Amino acid sequence: MISSKASDYQQRIGYVFTDPSLLLQALRHCSAGTPHNERLEFLGDSVVNLLIAEALFQRWPRADEGALTRARSELVRETSLASIARTMQLGEQLILGPGELKSGGHRRDSILADAVEAVIAAIYLDADLATCRTVVLPWFETALTALPVGKPEKDPKTRLQEWLQARQWSLPVYELIFESGDPHTKHFRVSCTLGELKLRTEGEGSSRRLAEQDAASHAINQLDSNK
């Protein structure tokens, strides 16, 4: 039986479920027992990538593969999905275990992003791809419109790599300094070393990839400040 709170939330996301149990599963973090949302998250990751790729393909008829790929990565990255979750007040609806609830899991980017993917999968399973497209794409409209057409900004690692390659210098070396937290609340610290420049920066994030991007961003900032 779906709660009145969850029932009201369906109006906020713009879709009323035929099978409300799918929404409840999408909102249940693994710390709260089963059935939780990890399988839905897996499916939702593929669905949202398809929807965004399709939207970009149609909107940017002259963009090359690289530009389309970078734009999609920008739109479906963890921080972007977490921003959508906050706009929809998704964190308030999450079903968390006592530990996650106490540690503020409903505010954590990784948990929010995973929940968005799970909700997308739930809509897809409850209806079909066409309905999912109609419901979900408006969530991304502001971010889609804000992207510079055909030329989305490259991520920090790509920008740093291209800057070094243009000068025929060695590529940066990323090393894990430490990781902490349980499997669902990981925190990573990574270093980025530029040999020829004797420059070393550090970055943090909820995944190693995000920590590397953060470290690369700090390196770019230092290079810019030394110009």
UniProtKB/Swiss-Prot annotation:
Active-site residues from the entry: 45, 117
Superkingdom of the source species: Bacteria
Location of region: Disordered: 203-227
One GO term of the biological process aspect: rRNA processing
Disulphide bonds in the chain: none
CDD domains (alphabetical): DSRM_RNAse_III_family (cd10845), RIBOc (cd00593)
UniProt-recorded Gene Ontology molecular function terms: double-stranded RNA binding; metal ion binding; ribonuclease III activity; rRNA binding
An annotated GO cellular component: cytoplasm
Biased composition, class Basic and acidic residues, residue ranges: 203-212
Family indicated by similarity: Belongs to the ribonuclease III family.
Purpose of the protein: Digests double-stranded RNA. Involved in the processing of primary rRNA transcript to yield the immediate precursors to the large and small rRNAs (23S and 16S). Processes some mRNAs, and tRNAs when they are encoded in the rRNA operon. Processes pre-crRNA and tracrRNA of type II CRISPR loci if present in the organism.
Name this polypeptide is given: Ribonuclease 3
